[in-house]
Regions:
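Conserved catalytic SET/PR domain of SAM-dependent protein methyltransferases, capturing the structural core
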Residues: 132-276
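A short, N-terminal "cap"/entry segment at the start of jelly-roll beta-barrel domains
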Residues: 1-40
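Short acidic-glycine-tyrosine-enriched beta hairpin
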Residues: 40, 71-91
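A generic structural signal for residues embedded in beta-strands
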Residues: 51, 70, 87, 209, ...
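Double-stranded beta-helix
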Residues: 97-141
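Conserved short histidine dyad/triad with adjacent acidic residue
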Residues: 37-54
Length: 276
């Protein structure tokens, strides 16, 4: 065990320098159960990881790996899985010696990951500025996707206003069922909010239920249209609908979200007609 001088200013300086470097794959799986949210991150060996500040006291479980951790009070210690402990609010820096799987476990009934991050993670000013810059750099031209969206809904007799009324209708919406998901809803460059991969997805992998017993989950409500989609809707025998990856989809790198998950609304609307 050793003692290192630690200040938030120094951490943010280090954070800014590392954010300029290529980011490694850091898949995040969001797991939900009755009254519980588990945020599970996997980080490869050889990675220096700077965590967001945790805002609450909560349970931590290290399922696999070995890491040299520097806590907010400057204490350096090597820990190896398996470990289970309660940690208070604060920020950690770790150098991953062996591939690591870490779970932060929170007591909550909330299932909206965007809201959960706002509740439990305090993201630094350095990180927020980096994200804004990334958004400017990654402002792809989605005009073809938007034009194709209008064409797709017109083919089925809808206009944008009618679609928006349905999107905003709260009567047919339902939370995702308990389970683990490699996705979250976040602001989209295509339109409003979209669904993004937080861990890599393989072709044919079920991303999430999109419709259950006639009600839309967040995956059914927020998945945007693309002229070149990477996912599709699959109708099940019981009438429910799953959102499924149509090709490999890249997940989180560092703390950055992965690819936006998109579908062709023509394909989704054709399923709706079959279902009805």
């Amino acid at each position: 065990m050793g003692q290192l001088l630690y200040t938030e200013q120094k951490v943010q300086t280090l954070e800014a320098a590392f954010l300029k470097q290529p980011q490694v794959n850091c898949p995040v799986v969001h797991r939900f159960g009755p009254g519980i949210y588990i945020r599970e991150v996997s980080i490869p060996a050889g990675t220096l990881s700077i965590g967001h500040r945790q805002t609450t006291t909560h349970l931590n479980v290290m399922l696999a790996g070995r890491v040299i951790m520097i806590s907010e009070d400057g204490v350096k210690i090597e820990i190896a899985a398996p470990q289970t402990f309660v940690a208070g609010p604060g920020r950690k820096i770790g150098y991953i010696l062996d591939d690591m799987i870490w779970q932060n476990i929170y007591a909550t009934d909330e299932t909206d990951v965007e809201k959960l991050e706002a509740m439990f993670l305090d993201k630094s000013q350095t990180w927020q500025e980096h994200q804004k810059n990334q958004q400017l750099l990654l402002s792809f031209d989605h005009s073809e996707d938007v034009a194709d969206y209008y064409a797709a809904i017109a083919e089925y007799g809808f206009d944008h206003d009618t679609v928006q009324v349905q999107v905003q209708n709260l009567d047919d919406q339902i939370d995702l069922p308990h389970g683990g998901y490699k996705m979250m809803v976040a602001p989209s460059k295509i339109d409003g909010k979209g669904v993004f991969a937080t861990a890599s997805l393989e072709a044919g992998e079920v991303i999430a239920p999109a419709r259950i017993a006639g009600k839309r989950t967040p995956a059914g409500r927020y998945t945007n249209h693309s002229k070149n989609p990477n996912a599709k809707m699959i109708l099940l025998d019981n009438g429910d609908v799953n959102l499924v990856a149509a090709m490999p989809i890249v997940g989180c790198k560092g703390g950055n979200l992965g690819e936006e998950i998109t579908i062709d609304y023509r394909q989704a609307l054709s399923l709706a007609i079959r279902r009805n």
